[in-house]
Every structure is written in C-alpha cells, then in structure tokens.
C-alpha cells in the first residue's frame, strides 16, 4: 500500500497530507523525486553526508565532554594534607590534571555528593568539635566552572570519629556513621544545601570476639539500598549489619524486621555494596579480609550463602580489608587489602550466588584505604594512604584485569575518591 497523492503546490509536496494518509510504509518513489536532476540529487546526497559527519562529530564531542570529571579526594590532615583536593580527569584522553586544594577542612575522610550534584558533604573525623566530644559534618557548594568548594556550614555528627556518610535519594536527609561514638545520626539538608543539627541519633549496642577491636560497637558505613528507604550499617564491633528504615518525612530511623544480620564471629564488617537489582549484598569484613555474600529479598539481606577470602592462599602477613566496589557490568567485584597492598578481583557467578577470587593487582602504594571506579567502570583510582599517592588503572570489562595506566598523582594521606561529571 502506498500513500495517496493529491494535487501538489510549490515543489510538488502533496498538499494537506495527513498522518492517516501516510500510516503505511512507502513502497514507491514519489514523482517529485523523479523530477530532480542527477546533479541535484548528488548535491543533496553530498549535503546529507556532510551533515551526518557534523552530527556524528557533535555527538562524539558531547560524549567526550560528558566524560570529563572533577575527582574529589578526601584525606587525613595534619602532615602534608590540608583538606579536600580536586583533580581534573579527561577519561577519553586519559589525561589527569594537577591536584589542587578544593577546601581546607580537618580530616575529611569520607565524602558524598548531593543528588543534585550542586553540593558536597564531608565527615570531619574528629574526637572534638566546637568544644564538645563529637565529630563534624561539613556542607559545601560546588562552584560551577571550577569545581572549587565553598563552605556553607558545619554541624556536629552525633558522635565521635565519624567515618562515613550518605545522602538519601530525595536530597533531604544525610546519614552518618560515627565509628568512635558507636552511633548513627540523621541530619536534615536545607534547600540551599546547608545542614541542620541531627534530628535522630541511634546508639548501637553489643560487642564480639576480637579482644581489642570488638569491645564495643563501631558503625563503619551507612548505605541506603537503591530505590528503597532501607538503611544498612555494617558494625565492625558487633559482627552485625544493622538494618533501619528511614522515615523520609521526619528523618527518624526505626528498626527493620529483621533488625540485623550477622557475619561469622570476629569478621568485623566494614563496608558493603549491592549487586545490580539489589539481589545480592556483598559485605567486606575488615578483620578477616573476607567477603560475605547475602541473598536478598526486596533489598533486605536474608540468607548468608558464602564467605570467601580476598587474600592469596599462601599469604601469611598482617592485613586488613578496606573497600569493596561492584563493576557496572555486574560481573566483577573488587576489594582492597591493606598489608598485602592489593586490589582483589572476584568474578561474580550470579546464577550460583558465588564469588570466585581470580587474581590481584598491586595497589600502587601502601595501605589502599579506598578506591573507586569511574561511572562507566573503565578506570579505577587506588588511594594509598601511607604513600600519599593515587594510582590509576584501566579496567578490562571482559576479564576484570587491572592494568597500570602510568598515571598517578600525589596527595597527602588520600582515603576517599568520588567522581563528579563536569557540567
């Protein structure tokens, strides 16, 4: 079936053509096309080709611009570091700028971006703030065009030694883990990005079997399961992953049902992350350098299905685990070892609910307290706390292999890496 033609005007386009007239695919060449000269047709084809090239180039340029990042580095201050640093990173060109001080602040050991990407928040891992035995949380506005940070305000963290924080998807609530104080606190975020004092502080209870590291609770991370109000807190001191529900109207935390899950005694859960779709939870245990895998139902960890070592079988030295990240492909899980000074590479067999340790890459320095993947999963930044350097690796999505790119930079005591796409 072909489009019905009517009497034409101008250049021969059918007059008053309707969508109904052309609802089927065209099977013949319209007469107005046939009347074009060969030369004119070639000219049009040439113009179309040129336009196609220009559109492709524009699309490539936009994609390239979208893959330029400001990389923020949280640090421990007091020796060579003065606060939060920033480097410019061009992923397509694999070019890294010189680190510059983005904000001067004490012990910003972990950072988090607001969902709007206009604000950045940092813990102040302190034992005292404004004359009180408590740590701090700082709010910054990200300066457009430069990525520099402008301090908005600071608030107490609700306990000593805050070590991790996150912002919920609504952008209204910030949750912080206070390692030293054994508490988890919720702070409200104002529309202008400033922080209000804590609206909720929950104290953990209990201990476990390690004689020095598990005498009391030590919340080490806070994570909100994607797409839910479930808050997960790995507590190194109690061998539990404590589960809460965040009330997005009040900011209050209430116990989930079940209120926690446990890892093997003496493990010391430090950080955790989900597989794609929240089907599995990977818990990195600091004290034993193992990963515990939980099967989840609606993001809630329900069944411990595996605990696997992140170290080579023949390694006999001292070691603690630090960070864990899932590759965007969902095929690879990476964790860091402090002592062995490596990044462990696991293949994830989802159908079997199993992690397989397939190898290690050197971290490029000593004590890789933190590392992170860029959003595409093509590069990994390894932050080595005790050698004051960040080393960049390329990631092979097919094999999980990490290859040193030869790119690195120096920052005093780097302990957190986050990426912000340059607007």
Report the location of each language-model feature.
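Blade-loop segments of beta-propeller domains
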Residues: 98-167
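Short glycine/acidic-enriched loop and turn motifs that connect beta-strands
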Residues: 77-80, 126-130, 180-182, 238-239, ...
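An edge-strand/N-cap motif at the start of beta-rich repeat modules
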Residues: 65-89
